[in-house]
Amino acid sequence: MAPERLEVLSTLKEITGFLNIQSHHDSFRNLGAFRNLEVIGGRTLTEYFASLYIVKTSLTSLGLRSLRKISSGSVAILENEELCYAGDINWTQIMRSQVHNTLLQNNRDPGKCIAGGAVCDKQCSSEGCWGPGNKMCLSCRTYNVDEECVPSCDPNLGLYEAGKEFISTLIILGQTTLLTSLIYASAFHFE
């Protein structure tokens, strides 16, 4: 199956069972089709007790930028010769089960990833990333604006920094209204 046919899954937010990826296709480079996947439930698991099982693929990065929770089951990412970034992810932030482990073996050598520039963006926190760019961070080093990690507020975008808060201006029917929104490194919330 051609990877672009997976785009039908781009609005998927939750898988109650497991995600099993075992495909080697030259143009299958990441799991971007699952970019909105937030939760893998693990109600049913693979025969290896995994809820995320990625084996012998042509992936270079995972691209699961919205994944925030694996309720049950282990993570097994094995024998993906071109895959970088998976070893940099702090899986304990995502996995809720204390009895399941993370098994990452025989993926691309981390030294080769670094030499090839396949490293997390400098705006990502130490939690890791799903792939290249400042939209693939597990969490941001400083600020998150519209799902993009940024080092500071940009006044040209109508964002102004006030301590750890952003002040944004909105123009409504010619009137300017100031809204204060608190940002604590990862949430953009208007009050």
Name these PLM-found stretches:
Residues C84, G111-C120, C153, I172:
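Functionally engaged cysteine thiol sites
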Residues N20, E38, Y53, A76, ...:
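Beta-strand cores of modular interaction/reader domains in eukaryotic scaffold and signaling proteins
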Residues M1-L6, C120, C124, C149, ...:
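Short intrinsically disordered, low-complexity coil segments enriched in acidic
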Residues M1, E7-A33, E38-L59, G63-L83, ...:
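Concave beta-strand-loop units of leucine-rich repeat
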Residues I70, A76-I77, N106, C113, ...:
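Residue-level signal for mature regions of secreted extracellular proteins and peptides
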Residues T44-Y48, E147, Y160:
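Short, flexible/disordered secondary-structure transition segments
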Residues P132-D154, E161-L170, L179-A187, E191:
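Short, disulfide-bonded extracellular cysteine-rich repeat modules
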Residues S23-H25, G63, K122-C129, K135-S139, ...:
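Short, recurring structural edge motifs at helix starts
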